Design a protein with these regions (language model features):
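Positively charged, low-complexity intrinsically disordered leader regions
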Residues: 1-30
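Short beta-strand segments enriched in small/hydrophobic residues
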Residues: 31-40
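Glycine-rich phosphate/diphosphate-binding loop of Rossmann-like nucleotide-binding domains
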Residues: 39-53, 136-225, 234, 238-249
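Short, well-structured alpha-helical segments in soluble
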Residues: 76-88
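Anion-binding alpha/beta catalytic cores of soluble intermediary-metabolism enzymes, centered on
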Residues: 91-156, 161
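Rossmann-fold NAD(P)-binding glycine/threonine-rich loop
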Residues: 106-126, 230-282
Length: 283
């Protein structure tokens, strides 16, 4: 049986570390502040918002909810973003996407200051991730993958990593983050030829294809570390990932469960970005 790389342990350790950093900031008169900007009330947004607020409360981050109606105009949305950009009490902004179809997503992202972009949605943040600078923050889920590997002391340097998925949210940024850790990274996707054979060559396999049960026993071998980033609802209401867990788990060395794996770490990464942004105001 594989070792389960549970996210709760990682989140707990990150939270404890952040609490110390927040206490140090308080001594200098700074309280980290996060604004959660949400348009409408999508169920998945509300679920993540609850988790983020709970995590921030544990850490000591002040959270402000900015909730706009589903029919908000582009001008109203941009106005709220500008207010948050200018507010010194707000060190970071989490803007839920996708936005309703009548809104211009690219324009909204461009309006947000990269320094306050906590989830890597602006072009400035993406540039920082690809350039390897600390001028922005990567998407929380991508950063959670790396944090999880480091917490469990999984060697990354020099290792062969295969990432299935090429999205700007996970696939591409996690590849860049792992490359910065000196891994040898191959990016694959649903149209890659000989995908199972490529996957078997990996020491670390990151599955972020967004397709339930895409990877099974045919794509893994003993000794591998598997990070399953997907999360999907089965017809019976249970959750599953991008791997067929029952097939993969008996073969590999370690795997993240779904639920309870990578996703459990994301709100702690969000909190770490807010704290880092608050610390930069003292530089």
């Amino acid at each position: 049986m594989a070792t389960l790389l549970k996210g709760a342990e990682v989140a707990k350790a990150l939270t404890a570390s952040l609490q110390g950093e927040v206490a140090a900031l308080a001594e200098r008169g700074v309280t980290p502040g996060l604004a959660i900007l949400r348009v409408g009330a999508r169920d998945d947004d509300l679920s993540y918002e609850r988790g983020a607020m709970k995590r921030c409360e544990k850490v000591g981050i002040a959270v402000r909810q900015v909730v706009l109606p589903e029919d908000v105009t582009q001008e109203q949305l941009l106005g709220e973003i500008e207010k948050l950009n200018a507010d010194p009490a707000i060190h970071g902004v989490l803007m839920f996407r996708p936005l309703p179809k009548h809104l211009n997503d690219a324009e909204a992202r461009a309006a947000l200051l990269p320094a306050k972009d906590m989830d890597g949605i602006t072009d400035g943040s993406m540039t920082a991730v690809y350039a390897g600078t600390d001028a922005g923050y990567p998407p929380c889920t991508a950063a959670a993958c790396v944090a999880l590997l480091k917490h469990y002391n999984v060697p990354i340097r020099g290792k062969r990593v295969v990432v299935i998925g090429r999205s700007l949210v996970i696939g591409k940024p996690v590849s860049m983050l792992l490359l910065a850790e000196h891994a040898t990274v191959t990016i694959c996707h649903s149209r890659s030829q000989n995908l199972p054979e490529i996957c078997k060559e990996a020491d670390i396999l990151v599955v972020a294809a967004g397709k339930a049960g895409m990877v099974g026993a045919e794509s893994v071998r003993p000794g591998q570390i598997v990070l399953d980033v997907g999360i999907h609802a089965n017809p019976d209401g249970t959750l599953c990932g991008d791997t067929r867990f029952a097939e993969v788990e008996p073969v590999v060395e370690a795997i993240t469960p779904v639920p309870g794996g990578v996703g459990t770490v994301t709100t702690s990464i969000l909190a770490s970005h807010v704290v880092a942004a608050a610390k930069k105001t003292l530089e």
